[in-house]
Amino acid sequence: NELRQIMLSPRELASDSLPNKNWINERLTFTHGYGVAAGPVNQVTSSGQPEFFIKDIPPQTTTSLKITRPEIYYGELANEYVLVRTKSQELDYPAGDQNIYTTYQGKGGVPIGSFWRKLVFAAHHASMRILLSQDLTGESRILFHQKIQERVKKIAPFITFDPDAYIVIAQGGRLFWIIDGYTNSARFPYSAPLSRQGMNYIRNSVKAVVDAYNGTVEFYLSDPADPIIQSFAKTFPHVFKPIDAMPEDLRAHVRYPQDLFTIQANVYATYHMQDPQVFFNKEDLLSIPRRTIEGRERDMEPYYTIMRLPGEEKEEFILLLPFTPNKRDNMRSWLAARSDGKNYGKLTALEFPKAKLVYGPKQIDARIDQDTIISQQLTLWSQRGSQVLRGSLLAIPIEKSLLYVQPLYLAAEQGSLPELKRIIVAFGNRITMDETLDL
């Protein structure tokens, strides 16, 4: 009965990387990806490698999580088209010195058994092999528009879709993709533009769900009050469903989108000022913290975490971003977007007292570099021929201050997998480094 944040990574098939690229391999044999790797974000093995809840092929699980339909025919790296239920076997996964094959049993695609259909698709895909292949039978089907971004855009071209789709495991063990959809405009009255394109209105009005096996697509109204999506819903009444119609096991995975939150954070940096005179003079502008990562200075990105917000009784899944005063490095405030239950979409902000110094991310980076114990250890690792990789610096609100956590990974120069070796924690004026966060 505890909230646990986990990472999921689908094992998709990148046909561009096939060692032996030919029409049969690309269209008949290597037709789909297989399964996911999943594990907790805060656990590693004794050697510093990720701890897995789901691993291997076929998927092996150590928890109640299960995958009953691991094949991924529709995803982010899918083929232009594939042919299934043919005389050629589809590779499912390798097992030792042999391969395991399968036959597609889903309802995706369209039949391609007749001569005329073969002719039409051969012309459409500019491939005479579709028309002339002896591998096709009366039961064969062609699966196309397998890339999920392309698929949802074909159905709803009037919606702008988030490029960062994420895969989830439904309660029955099936895999689904969730994609955030936006309605936007550049013609909203009395609204400042957000970009060079002039957009001054945006709403996360749609959640698209794509079945990774069958390719079926459902659109759910996540912001039914948006007048633009109301108009589209009336025009296409059978395309959109209310968010309450989304199955509960999928709805539990819905999260607040990072791109929308980043836009709102940039607006909040100016419009958090309530006093008209202060606002007019821009006396209290905020900035998104900047950090030096791999030699380049970049804006800090919002990140998902589980924490208990001030005034709340229990922890929840949120999207968080801290702020610094304009052209200064100390921390000024943070903004959080909530994702759980009835609180979905609510934004919470907390400002630190101006009289209290709370270190910002750039200042913490500098203090880590200046710490003699930490710098000596980093130098020692580097002298032994290892590469030190500093992970994301997370700022976790603790009452009216911040706890900073940064993992350190070690990798050999000859391409070995990085291993978690140390964790740096900073709170107030204290900085420490240890092998674990456990007390």
Show which residues each predicted segment covers.
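Soluble extracytoplasmic regions of secretory-pathway and membrane proteins
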Residues: N1-L439
